[in-house]
């Protein structure tokens, strides 16, 4: 054994590591490069991933050699009773007796830190208090890291340092859907190809650029000869229909499951959408991205590749990270983003891709 930066004993070759990252979908994508490096650095270790059951499909599509430990905290919170209590106790007992040497809390929430603590691992790694979503999480860590970098993917890689891992900042992990999802999307597209994919939705109301703007953007792109497809998430079909109406009815509507969404991204020429899971899926698939940012920070959460385009308004009040409504009542960070700005972003990203495809001029 050697010593961690804080002087505690470090397990140089851990046999079992518990990764804690519940979600959301985009957050899980951000965590993949760090877990990839754990696997590369400790090829003989067993690495388990504690994740919300609804998000485990993302890890499955990554192809990473981890054991998924699904958890359903939503059901536990909303279905209290003897059955749930028994299930929780059995889960905690299993966690404590699995013999983990180390846990890494990539989430930074009180519940994620607490579950890491319940694992009884002697080394529990997390961020310093100022970088946590819930500062009380700090009490459950034995090792804390103060990130030096801005992007969340980099910050998560920095959590590997107490284990003696020097982060490889260029590590990427691509998502690959199952063959059944690819076949389903091929059937839905029915020959439709070389298209721009728009995903207008998002769990946060404050991240959604309005349907009229997306519709006008689709119209501009189609006038340039670029086919446009629109997809959406649960409860967002009406937004997609409004885009179709504002665009003049000629966009391709493609409903998709989570796995089908990744397959759909594989077939797209360009992705356009907000700071949501689908945007991060598109980036992880490797297609060009134009991301529209409102109340969140593109420096921290934006697409990781430098060639991808972020459209945003630099304002003193952002980022505020408000989910449901603008605290100032205007949401100018999103409302003031014009169709022309996003259209120009699309042209810029497509031009870069075309230049990259042809190679440097002689």
Feature map (PLM): residue ranges:
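Catalytic machinery of carbohydrate-active enzymes
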Residues: 1-362
């Amino acid at each position: 054994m050697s010593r961690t930066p804080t002087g505690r004993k470090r397990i140089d070759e851990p046999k079992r590591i518990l990764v804690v990252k519940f979600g959301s979908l985009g957050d899980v994508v951000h965590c993949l490069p760090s877990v990839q490096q754990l696997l590369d650095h400790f090829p003989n270790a067993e690495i388990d991933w504690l994740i919300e059951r609804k998000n485990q499909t993302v890890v499955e599509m990554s192809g990473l050699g981890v054991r998924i430990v699904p958890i359903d905290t939503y059901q536990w919170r909303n279905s209290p009773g003897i059955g749930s209590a028994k299930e929780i106790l059995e889960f905690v007992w299993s966690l404590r007796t699995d013999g983990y040497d180390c846990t890494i809390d990539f989430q930074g929430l009180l519940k994620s830190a607490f579950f890491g603590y319940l694992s009884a691992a002697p080394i529990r790694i997390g961020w310093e208090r100022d970088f946590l979503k819930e500062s009380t999480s700090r009490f459950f860590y034995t090792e804390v890291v103060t990130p030096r970098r801005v992007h969340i993917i980099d910050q998560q890689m920095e959590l590997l340092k107490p284990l003696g891992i020097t982060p490889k900042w260029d590590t990427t992990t691509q998502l690959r859907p199952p063959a059944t999802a690819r076949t389903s999307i091929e059937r839905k597209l029915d020959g439709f190809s070389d298209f721009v994919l728009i995903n207008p939705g998002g769990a946060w109301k404050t991240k959604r650029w309005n349907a009229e703007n997306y519709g006008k953007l689709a119209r501009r792109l189609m006038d340039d000869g670029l086919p446009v497809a629109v997809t959406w998430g649960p409860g967002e079909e009406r937004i997609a229909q409004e885009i179709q109406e504002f665009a003049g009815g000629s966009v391709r509507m493609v409903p998709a499951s989570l796995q089908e969404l990744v397959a759909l991204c594989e077939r797209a020429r360009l992705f356009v959408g907000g700071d949501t899971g689908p945007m991060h899926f598109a980036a992880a698939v490797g297609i060009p991205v134009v991301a529209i940012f409102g109340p969140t920070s593109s420096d921290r959460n934006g697409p990781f590749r430098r060639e991808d385009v972020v459209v945003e308004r630099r304002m003193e009040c952002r980022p505020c990270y408000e989910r449901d409504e603008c605290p100032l009542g205007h949401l100018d960070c999103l409302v003031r983003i014009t169709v022309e700005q996003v259209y120009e972003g699309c042209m810029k990203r497509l031009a870069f891709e075309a230049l990259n495809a042809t190679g440097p001029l002689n």
